[in-house]
């Protein structure tokens, strides 16, 4: 169902529904806490959908995607891309209802944001926000959503229900058969709710619970302590901090209390302490993640003898931040470059190894500079292609090199037909042989031999830098 948008037509209808009554506090939370994470376009899409509910409470009227395209001034691909951010962060659910006549109706259910206390104690979103807006703005936002608590020395003297209504007669509590039918909720209906905040989801393949539990006896961690909330928190913390199942055993054991209870707050603190000990106090960051083990090629001796194999192993083993540092002779990457990479990793959900191939390719094409628009365009293209491994990314870069060149040069196909273009480009050596063969077959102009040798020399120099500064 992830590719349903490819078949969506502008005339296809949709309706907007809200999980609960959205209020002004929800608007403030989304504007100030979520917008820095999802970006202005996704934020605008949420507000546009919300606007259809203003006069209709929890359900809006039927509209078409053409009308939505007109309201947002976006095409269906862009709407789908921004919609994905809302889905991933827990602000939107999408349903498709198909009739017997093959007519489809899309239902967009708006979900309220996390409450401020839930957001700032989440362990993932709050860290992501901190890295997006910086320490000063983060503190300002946190201050905005906090207020003084009731003093601890104040005594609660609230009267209970049974004291306030002690004079009620037994007849007033009697439930008759006629009343039972009246109070029962009709099938297919749900009560109006306010402020329910379902959390975003992390897929099950992020963490191996079987391996985690295999090393823990019932005495050490009672299974009753492993509630669904605890499991969800473990998945989030594993993804955020890069904690594997065996390491997580120690984290959980340090979080359980004397009553055999594990709280989410204790888990977050234990995971944070573990991470800061491992990383000398540094906060987690998407750009410091490496390619997941299940998406690596593993040991392949035959491939290791080739440059392709060595490069794949390298790009799988290091983080995007480390790659940028290695390319710059060990110099710390600029905050601007890191922000660009972090944005594409989060928004396009690219794996770290795939991101490395993208960095490697783009920097060679743009004289060792990260062009934001160029890298974002290729990243969104790879995300739609569902590229997950380093080899897949390299293969796609080879196959679609000319298309990327057109994007970089800003030229249309019509202009390319009207003039002869001599391309003087930087080609990674893992692309050179295949690109040359392709050029020969298609009759298109190739790189001059002198330029090609110069670029191969530069590429080998860059590879030596990577080998010097990277251990894999």
UniProtKB/Swiss-Prot annotation:
In early growth phase only full-length protein is detected, during late growth and stationary phase full-length and C-terminally truncated proteins are seen (at protein level). Truncated protein is only seen in cytoplasmic fractions. One of its GO terms (biological process) is DNA replication, synthesis of primer. Residues 303-411 are annotated as: DDBH2-2. Disruption phenotype: Essential, it cannot be deleted; in depletion experiments DNA replication slows as soon as the protein is degraded and replication stops by 1 hour. GO terms for molecular function: ATP binding; DNA binding. Residues 1-112 are annotated as: DDBH1. It is found in: Cytoplasm; Cell membrane. The dna-1 (dnaBI) and dnaB-19 (dnaBII) mutants show different characteristics for replication and membrane binding of plasmid pUB110. DnaBI is essential for both chromosome and pUB110 replication, whereas dnaBII is necessary only for chromosome replication. Bind ssDNA via the N-terminus (residues 1-300), which also mediates tetramerization. A region in the C-terminus (residues 365-428) also binds ssDNA, dsDNA and is responsible for DNA-mediated oligomerization. Has 3 domains with homology to DnaD called DDBH1 and DDBH2 (DnaD DnaB Homology 1 and 2) followed by a short positively charged region and a probable C-terminal alpha-helix. Removal of residues 429-472 increases dsDNA and some ssDNA binding, while removal of 312-472 prevents all DNA binding. This is Replicative helicase loading/DNA remodeling protein DnaB. The gene is dnaB.
């Amino acid at each position: 169902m992830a590719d349903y948008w490819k078949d969506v037509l502008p005339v296809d209808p949709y309706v907007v529904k809200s999980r609960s009554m959205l209020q002004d506090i929800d608007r403030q939370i989304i504007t100030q806490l979520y917008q820095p994470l999802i970006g202005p376009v996704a934020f605008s899409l949420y507000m546009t959908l919300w606007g259809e509910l203003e006069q209709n409470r929890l359900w809006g009227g039927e509209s078409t995607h053409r009308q939505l395209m007109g309201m947002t001034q976006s095409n269906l691909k862009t709407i789908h891309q921004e919609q994905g951010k809302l889905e991933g962060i827990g602000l939107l659910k999408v349903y498709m209802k198909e009739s017997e006549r093959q007519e489809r109706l899309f239902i967009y259910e708006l979900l309220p944001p996390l409450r401020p206390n839930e957001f700032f104690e989440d362990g993932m979103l709050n860290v992501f926000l901190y890295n997006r807006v910086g320490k000063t703005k983060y503190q300002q936002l946190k201050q905005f959503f906090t207020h003084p608590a009731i003093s601890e020395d104040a005594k609660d003297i609230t009267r209970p229900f049974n004291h306030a209504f002690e004079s009620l007669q037994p007849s007033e509590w009697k439930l008759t058969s006629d009343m039972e039918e009246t109070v029962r909720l009709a099938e297919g209906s749900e009560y109006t709710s306010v402020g329910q905040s379902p959390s975003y989801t992390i897929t099950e393949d992020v963490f191996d619970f079987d391996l985690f539990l295999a090393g823990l006896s019932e005495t050490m961690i009672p299974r009753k302590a492993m509630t669904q909330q605890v499991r969800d928190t473990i998945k989030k913390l594993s993804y955020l901090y890069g904690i594997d199942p065996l390491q997580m055993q120690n984290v959980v054991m340090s979080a359980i209390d004397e009553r055999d209870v594990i709280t989410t707050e204790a888990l977050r603190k234990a995971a944070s302490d573990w991470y800061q000990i491992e990383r000398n106090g540094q906060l987690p960051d998407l750009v410091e993640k490496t390619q997941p083990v299940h998406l690596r090629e593993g040991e392949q001796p035959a491939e290791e003898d080739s440059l392709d194999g060595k490069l794949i192993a390298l790009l799988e083993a290091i983080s995007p931040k480390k790659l940028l540092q290695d390319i710059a002779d060990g110099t710390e990457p600029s905050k601007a470059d890191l922000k660009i990479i972090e944005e594409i990793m989060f928004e396009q959900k690219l794996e770290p190894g795939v991101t490395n191939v993208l960095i490697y390719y783009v920097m060679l094409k743009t004289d060792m500079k990260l062009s934001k628009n160029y890298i974002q365009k290729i990243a969104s293209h790879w995300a739609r292609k569902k590229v997950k491994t380093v080899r897949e990314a390299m293969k796609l870069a080879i196959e679609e090199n000319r298309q990327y060149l057109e994007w970089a040069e800003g030229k249309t196909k019509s202009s390319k037909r009207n003039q002869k273009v001599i391309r003087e480009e930087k080609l990674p050596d893992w692309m050179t042989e295949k690109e040359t063969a392709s050029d020969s077959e298609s009759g298109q102009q190739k790189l001059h031999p002198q330029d090609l040798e110069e670029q191969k020399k530069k590429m080998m120099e860059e590879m030596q830098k990577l080998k010097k500064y990277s251990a894999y």
